Amino acid sequence: MIAAPMQEGDGRRRSVFRPCIDLHNGTVKQIVGGTLRDAQDGSGGDDPHALTTNFVATHPPSYYAKLYARHNLRGGHVIKLGPGNDEAAASALQEWPNHLQIGGGIHLDNAVSWIERGAEKVIVTSYLFPECRFSLERLLALEKRVGRDRLVVDISCRRRGSEWIVAMNRWQDLTDMRVSKGAYKRDREREREADNESQSL
């Protein structure tokens, strides 16, 4: 669960809760950021010595989706942290169709199928950064496939010195995108370019 501070019109601050269902090996977990890493033996699995969790659920993901639906906690997401989570993610989406976003391994070829399985929106990061470099072409293609209203671009960052850099692949790989006021202005220009380009698609 994430508590995001928001400001009322009268200047007072309040918290808006964003429910999360983070899945690792089919189980709901709260993992300490940056501790989910690939194993060094080339097996394709996770490094068990690096992984640190704050919470490992005994209930299935569908339980939490049903709980969020009962309390009308909107704006939540289901994140698949690695392989082996598709079935668990689908079970959560089915409990509250069109109200939970889905992320983790989303790309051009599977985005629509997750919408069809009940996701309100798809969340994407790694697909937009081939070789860790941002691809506007991929973003436009994905927008055309699912529609802008169904697409969320995750720019989770890691700090390096005084900079915040967008990270991908379970926060292991740093991309070429820095988050700053200057980058925001450039992204606004890119967004205008994307608007013009998408109109001609």
Task: Please give the residue ranges for each predicted region.
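N-terminal basic/disordered segments at the start of proteins
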Residues: 9-26, 30
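Conserved anion-binding
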Residues: 24, 29-36, 110, 115-189
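A short acidic, glycine-rich active-site loop
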Residues: 41-58, 172-178
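Hydrophobic faces of well-ordered beta-strands that scaffold small-molecule active sites
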Residues: 16-21, 76-78, 98-104, 122-124, ...
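N-terminal active-site wall of soluble small-molecule enzyme domains
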Residues: 38, 42-46, 57, 61-117
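Eukaryotic N-terminal low-complexity, Ser/Thr- and Lys/Arg-rich leader segments
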Residues: 1-15, 42-44, 192
